[in-house]
Amino acid sequence: MTAALTVRGATKRFGPVLALDEVDLEVQHGEVLAVLGDNGAGKSTLIKCISGVHRLDAGEIEIDGLPVHITSPAAARAHGIETVYQDLALFDNLEPAANFYAGREDAGPRWLPRPLRVLRRRSMADATVELLERLQVSLPDHAATVGLMSGGQRQVIAVARAAVFASKVVILDEPTAALGVRESRRVLDLILRLRAEGHAVIVISHAMDHVTEVADRAVVMRRGRKVGEEIPSPDSQERIVALIVGTSG
């Protein structure tokens, strides 16, 4: 089976610091892959290279088995990769539909120059409601601005927005950080629904119980290198922690 995303020999330096050292990684369609590691392990650098924030110094990235050159976030999105960072990048003064389509507004008629086109607000709002219903995301008021919503509601909006435009891979950076039990549950359920719809999902997380629940595989990084891989389960948690802190073997 051809992987949705394959990374081979990913290497990245920042001056004298070797942030990524020949990292290999792959994730299949309909799979949740957790990338684990302590602070400074290279997790964030890896996803930023996949997302086009940083350029790899060496190595290659493939989408569905085909080499791609990801030189910017726009290039990553063009290849079907969407990333949700911890800050979510939502506009607090806009409602969910406007956040979904920010920078990708549906406007027409198409034969007019872009500055003269009229926003199709009703179409965007209806499409947003339809998507949220498909993903079983419930919001108290679709017309409310996201700044008035809870942390969990904001997180599921950001994840759902990524799912709208990600044809291949959704990357989630600490998706349950600072959320309560109920709000974390909403996000975890959404991750499982993304997997069921065939998305390849990469999750960066320190929450081992959440990783055990939703991830099919876990890759462990330390000091810029991939040091191991495990199937997350209660039985493997001790081995995963040993890989993270460097006491395995």
What residue ranges belong to the model's regions?
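Glycine-rich phosphate-binding loops of nucleotide-dependent enzymes
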Residues: 2-249
